[in-house]
Amino acid sequence: MVGFDDEKKKIVHELVDINNANRSVISMVGMGGLGKTTLAKSVYNDFEVKRSFDIFAWVIISQEYTIHEVLKRIKSEVSATPLADTIQDLSVAISEKLKKGKYLIVLDDVWKEDAWTELLKVFPDVNNGSRVIITTRFLNVAKIADPTIQPHELRLLNIKESKELFLRKVFPRQNTETCCSDDLLDSAHQLVKRCGGLPLALVVLGGLVSTKPQTKDAWQKVVESMKRQFVKGGDKCLEILALSYNDLPHYLKSCFLYFGCFGEDMNIPSKTVIRLWSAEGFLPTENGKTIEESGFDCLVELAQRCLIQVTEHEYDDGVKYCQIHDLLRDMCISEAKDNRFLEIYQNDTVDRATMPNAARRLIIFNEIKTLNYSNSKLRGLFYSLGSYQRLDFAALNGQLGKFKLLRVLYVNKLVISEFPSEIK
């Protein structure tokens, strides 16, 4: 945890403080990409914390949420057993379960005050030292959650910390003090200064540089690229993310843009991504390698460049699940729209929608009743629904035959008795 060791110690102390029996809410506040979730995970998995609580739950809230879905996630995490599935029954069941032990609940990425006020009643205060952790970009959310406790406002990294984090990403398995020459250190200093101390920018830039030769000339080319791309007064983080995207080989750009097809904070199975890439013909064919092996190579390179995060490994250290940071996902979607790679509809009903640029993929993130839509160039139709949403395939009755070029139909949550005749 470069730059946040002292903050972590303070938070751990607040969590395990035996002199505070009240249920307390500890908030971490800061802009996107500052490392709130990384710090929260480090605290959550700390040995002293793990042995101090009985019940644990980690729930991502995000911008688009429903209280019903959040409660279902909490119920699943704490193994509560409601008799029914209503908000009221879920709330009662969770509260009763949490009364039985000392709990630690993490609410990650809370955007609105309403999210906390709606959830407050399910976290009982039985004077046993239970805790709730909130990560948020907004100070008002932190203050309303627990006015008695000062929020932890995370700071930007200083230049020394920035260089340390950057070099850790460039040389993940090496000692930076012995493998980094003075010439490279000089280039590193020029690079990290442009990141403004933002951890996400530093790790993405470090991931980019890790793919380059370890020479002064190669690193200086990255410095010059940054100088050409950066606009005075522009968002440095977004410019660095764009620089890293533009550095990708052509085939890997398409693979990366595909992550815009998945919901925010979704834990994505690697095999699902690889099958989709394969169906689209994105994966390079190399002698002696299967399509699946090429797909895993692409995932590994995207992870090395810190454009995606590996959330779970296979037994052989391969990628099992992955995720994309919400800022990177925002950039991914923006770039994908500009290139007519995809278009997103999040309204309840897509009714005779007309794509202005005939994008090749349509992404739907919410449940819909009907799909009355035409696009002769559509290659992919994605229903990327929330954890507890379901698609009734009746919404597609008579629709799929319109999409003559359709190569991919992706539905992650499905209620179906038989397939539509168009795809039997």
What are these regions (language model features)?
Residues 8, 12, 41, 67-75, ...:
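An amphipathic alpha-helix signature
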Residues 25, 56-58, 132, 151-154, ...:
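Conserved beta-strand scaffold positions in the cores of enzyme catalytic domains, especially
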Residues 45-46, 111-114, 136-142, 366-369, ...:
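Short, polar loop motifs at secondary-structure junctions
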Residues 67, 87-90, 184, 188, ...:
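Short amphipathic alpha-helix in the helical subdomain of ABC transporter nucleotide-binding domains
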Residues 100-105, 127-133:
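Loop/turn-to-beta-strand initiation segments
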Residues 124-126, 177-178, 208-255, 259-424:
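Surface-exposed helical/coil interface segments that assemble multiprotein signaling complexes
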